[in-house]
């Protein structure tokens, strides 16, 4: 099975102004944790990253920079022609620039694109764009699978806007035990979706919990941790609780052979 992590291409104290050596150090840690797949979120990463992934035998999820909805306000207004042309161009550039890297297994056409589904009555202006991007990717590279990372607000099944069936494979961003719910919510999501779409492989593109270096506990159930800070108080995110979340979620994932790949969010913070 594909078990791995997602990562950004930044580095402590440097932001994006990183060197190839910084990337090598990051990928060495990816190897150390035993990952065999890497999600390069949420945009094209530097050529050196792909070169090293080729050499290390990692299976790469490469992603176009299409995040959230097609508008910042109401989701019942269609995407403009200019927007669609722009995101199509960026997907084509991603594929044409990185096509020759053997490590790449999937082209991701988007991340959490139903984020605006709760606005304006949950109108759908997203799936037409995603379907078009799938067509673009298959025209550019018929031999590789397309994918996307689906977000259902609150973690409730598919949500109002369904993106299943658009890409060859797909995956879920789910934060049970952190932003909402318990581990049984993930069980219901995965088993229910697999029963409904048994012919389309489903993965988990994001899961996890916050982990602050300065927060620790000897009772992971004594909490409660806080995903967000509040006025006058900072968030409380003990590392041990993050490890507990990973262990519980991973137990669910490992027991479901129909899950094609899983990615912890995130390898580096």
Residue ranges and their predicted role:
Residues 13-15, 154-158:
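A short, acidic/glycine-rich surface segment
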Residues 96, 157-160:
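Switch/coupling sub-region of P-loop NTPases
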Residues 1-116, 122-131, 146-147, 170, ...:
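Active-site-adjacent substrate/metal-binding segments within catalytic domains
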């Amino acid at each position: 099975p594909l078990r791995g992590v997602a990562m950004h291409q930044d580095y402590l104290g440097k932001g994006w102004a990183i060197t190839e050596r910084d990337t090598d150090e990051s990928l060495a840690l990816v190897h150390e944790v035993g990952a065999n797949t890497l999600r390069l979120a949420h945009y094209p990463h530097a050529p050196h990253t792909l070169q090293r992934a080729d050499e290390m035998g990692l299976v790469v999820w490469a992603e176009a920079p299409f995040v959230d909805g097609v508008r910042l306000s109401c989701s019942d207004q269609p995407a403009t022609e200019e927007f669609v042309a722009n995101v199509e161009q960026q997907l084509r550039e991603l594929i044409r620039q990185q096509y020759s890297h053997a490590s790449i297994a999937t082209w991701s056409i988007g991340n959490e694109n139903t984020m605006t589904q709760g606005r304006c009555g949950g109108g759908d202006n997203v799936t037409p764009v995603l379907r078009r991007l799938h067509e673009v990717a298959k025209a550019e590279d018929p031999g590789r699978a397309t994918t996307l990372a689906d977000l259902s607000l609150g973690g409730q099944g598919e949500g109002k806007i369904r993106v299943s069936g658009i890409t060859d494979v797909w995956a879920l961003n789910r934060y049970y035990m952190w932003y909402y719910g318990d581990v049984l919510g993930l069980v219901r999501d995965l088993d229910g979706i697999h029963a409904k779409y048994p012919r389309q492989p489903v993965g988990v593109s994001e899961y996890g919990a916050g982990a602050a270096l300065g927060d620790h506990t000897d009772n992971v159930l004594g909490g409660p941790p806080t995903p967000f800070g509040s006025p006058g108080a900072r968030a409380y995110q003990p590392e041990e609780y993050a490890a507990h979340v990973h262990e519980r979620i991973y137990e669910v994932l490992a027991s479901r052979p129909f899950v094609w790949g899983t990615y912890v969010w995130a390898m580096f913070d």
